[in-house]
From Swiss-Prot:
This is 4-hydroxy-3-methylbut-2-enyl diphosphate reductase, chloroplastic. It is found in: Plastid, Chloroplast stroma. Signal peptide: none annotated. The gene is HDR. Belongs to the IspH family.
Length: 464
C-alpha cells in the first residue's frame, strides 16, 4: 500500500497535557491538559505536540497504558487464537525441513532453509492480540491505524475478520470516522503520539500490539530528549515505525544509510571527513522531510544519540553509531565524548538473528535464493540485500502468485525495483536456499515452494 505523507490537521480537544496524580488503584483520576492545539504528524516533519515544551510524551504514554480503555496484553483468549493461527499459517513442508536439519529433497529440488526465518515473536504476538480483539468484541466496529504487519496474507485475513483500516484522504487519516465505543488496534510498528492523543480524546477502546522492541527504542529517544541530545535515527523517514519513534523524540534527524550518515558527520566536521556536505541550506534541503521542527544543524548536532528502526541492517546501524562516536571524538576530544554522544543497543534480536542466518546461508552451495516477504517489509528487503551483495541469484517475492506458468517470475530487488524474468529456474537438479521476513507466515513459504516443485515436475515430464 502506497501512502503519500504530509502534515495534516485533525480537530481534537486541546485540553490535554501532563497528568494529574493517579489513584491508588492505578487508574487515571485527573485529565490531561495541554495549552496549545496540535496537528497530527504524517511526514518527516515533527508534530506540534512533540515540539510543545509543556507536553511530556512519556508521561502521557504511561497514563494511557494505565487507563481502562487501553489493552496491550490480550483478553484471555490466547490458547484459542493461537490454535486458529496455527491452522491458518503453519506449514507441513516447513515442519519437514525443520525435522531434517533444515534441508530436504523433493524430486530434483533440494531446499535449504535458513536457521532463523519467518514470524518473529513480536509479530506473532501482534497478530494474536488482534485476533483476540475480534473474539472479545464480536459486534463492535474495529479499526486499525496501519497494516498490522507488512504481509499481504495476514492483512487480508484481518480484512476478512472485519478489521478496517482508518481511511486516508489526501494523506490525512480520517480519525473523525471513529466513534465512541469503537475499538482501534495499534499495529506492531506502533503509532505516533498525536495518533494516540486523537484516539484517547475520542474515548475508544485501544488495543496496542506495538512490539516491545519498538517501545524500547521509544525509551531510548526519550532518554536522548531528557539529556538534550539530538536523536540520530537510522531508518526510513516515511516508515510507520520511524514516524512513531520520531514522535517520542525531542530533536531528531533520520538517516537512511551510511552515505547519509557520512554526510551528516562531514557537516559536523566542517567538510573535513570526506567533503560530501555543503552549505546549511543544502543540508536542510536534503533532510527536509527527515528532521524535527525547527532543526538547526549548526545548533542541534553538538550532542547526539543513536537509535534505529528495528528492522534496519544490524551491521549498518553499528557502523553509523561508531562513525558518529568517532566524529564527536574528533570534534570535541576523547575526554569529552560522554558530553556529546550517547549510544544504546536498540537492534531487535529477531532482526539480528534472521540477518545472521542469511549471512550464513549465502556461504552455502546453492543455485538460487528465495526471499519471501511483503514488498513493503523493511526487514525482508535487507535479507534480499545480503544475497544481492553476495552475488547469488535471489528472488524477493511476497506470494506464490509472483511465480507464473512457463518458468516466469516477478520479483523485487532490495531497493524496490520490480523485475520480471523468464527461465529463472535452472534445468536439472537444483539447490534452493529459502528464508522469509519476520512478518511472513510459514504457509506463504510453503505455497511458494509448491509452485517451484510444480515447475520442476513439469520440466521432468517434458524431458521424459
Amino acid at each position: 500500500m502506497s501512502i503519500t505523507f504530509q502534515l495534516c490537521r485533525i480537530p481534537i480537544r486541546t485540553d490535554l497535557a501532563l497528568a494529574e496524580p493517579l489513584s491508588v488503584t492505578g487508574t487515571v483520576t485527573g485529565t490531561l491538559r495541554c495549552r496549545k492545539p496540535f496537528v497530527i504528524r504524517c511526514s518527516g516533519e515533527s508534530s506540534s505536540t512533540a515540539a510543545d515544551s509543556d507536553f511530556d510524551a512519556k508521561v502521557f504514554r504511561k497514563n494511557l497504558v494505565r487507563s481502562k480503555n487501553y489493552n496491550r496484553k490480550g483478553f484471555g483468549h490466547k490458547e484459542e487464537t493461537l490454535q486458529l493461527m496455527d491452522s491458518e499459517y503453519t506449514s507441513d513442508i516447513i515442519k519437514t525441513l525443520k525435522d531434517n536439519g533444515n534441508e530436504y529433497r523433493w524430486g530434483n529440488v533440494t531446499v535449504k532453509l535458513a536457521e532463523a526465518y519467518g514470524f518473529c515473536w513480536g509479530v506473532e504476538r501482534a497478530v494474536q492480540i488482534a485476533y483476540e480483539a475480534r473474539k472479545q468484541f464480536p459486534e463492535e466496529k474495529i479499526w486499525i491505524t496501519n497494516e498490522i504487519i507488512h504481509n499481504p496474507t495476514v492483512n487480508k485475513r484481518l480484512e476478512e475478520m472485519k478489521v478496517e483500516n482508518i481511511p486516508i484522504d489526501e494523506g490525512r487519516k480520517q480519525f473523525e470516522i471513529v466513534n465512541k465505543g469503537d475499538v482501534v488496534i495499534l499495529p506492531a510498528f506502533g503509532a505516533g503520539v498525536d495518533e494516540m492523543l486523537a484516539l484517547s480524546d475520542r474515548n475508544v477502546q485501544i488495543v496496542d500490539t506495538t512490539c516491545p522492541w519498538v517501545s524500547k527504542v521509544w525509551n531510548t529517544v526519550e532518554k536522548h530528549k531528557k539529556g538534550e541530545y539530538t536523536s540520530i535515527i537510522h531508518g526510513k523517514y516515511a516508515h510507520e515505525e520511524t514516524i512513531a519513534t520520531a514522535s517520542f523524540a525531542g530533536t531528531y534527524i533520520i538517516v537512511k544509510n551510511m552515505k547519509e550518515a557520512m554526510y551528516v558527520c562531514d557537516y559536523i566536521l566542517g567538510g573535513q571527513l570526506d567533503g560530501s556536505s555543503s552549505t546549511r541550506e543544502e543540508f536542510m534541503e536534503k533532510f527536509k522531510n527527515a528532521v524535527s521542527k525547527g532543526f538547526d544543524p549548526d545548533k542541534h548536532l553538538v550532542k547526539a544519540g543513536i537509535a534505529n528502526q528495528t528492522t534496519m541492517l544490524k551491521g549498518e546501524t553499528e557502523e553509523i553509531g561508531k562513525l558518529v562516536e568517532r566524529t564527536m571524538m574528533q570534534k570535541y576530544g576523547v575526554e569529552n565524548i560522554n558530553e556529546h554522544f550517547q549510544s544504546f543497543n536498540t537492534i531487535c534480536d529477531a532482526t539480528q538473528e534472521r540477518q545472521d542466518a542469511m549471512y550464513k546461508m549465502v556461504e552455502e552451495r546453492i543455485d538460487l535464493m528465495l526471499v519471501v516477504g511483503g514488498w513493503n517489509s523493511s526487514n525482508t528487503s535487507h535479507l534480499q540485500e545480503i544475497a544481492e551483495e553476495r552475488g547469488i541469484p535471489s528472488y524477493w517475492i511476497d506470494s506464490e502468485q509472483r511465480i507464473g506458468p512457463g518458468n516466469k517470475i516477478a520479483y523485487k530487488l532490495n531497493h524496490g525495483e520490480l523485475v520480471e524474468k523468464e527461465n529463472w529456474l535452472p534445468e536439472g537438479p537444483i539447490t534452493v536456499g529459502v528464508t522469509s521476513g519476520a512478518s511472513t507466515p510459514d504457509k506463504v513459504v510453503e505455497d511458494v515452494l509448491i509452485k517451484v516443485f510444480d515447475l520442476k515436475s513439469e520440466e521432468a515430464l517434458q524431458v521424459a
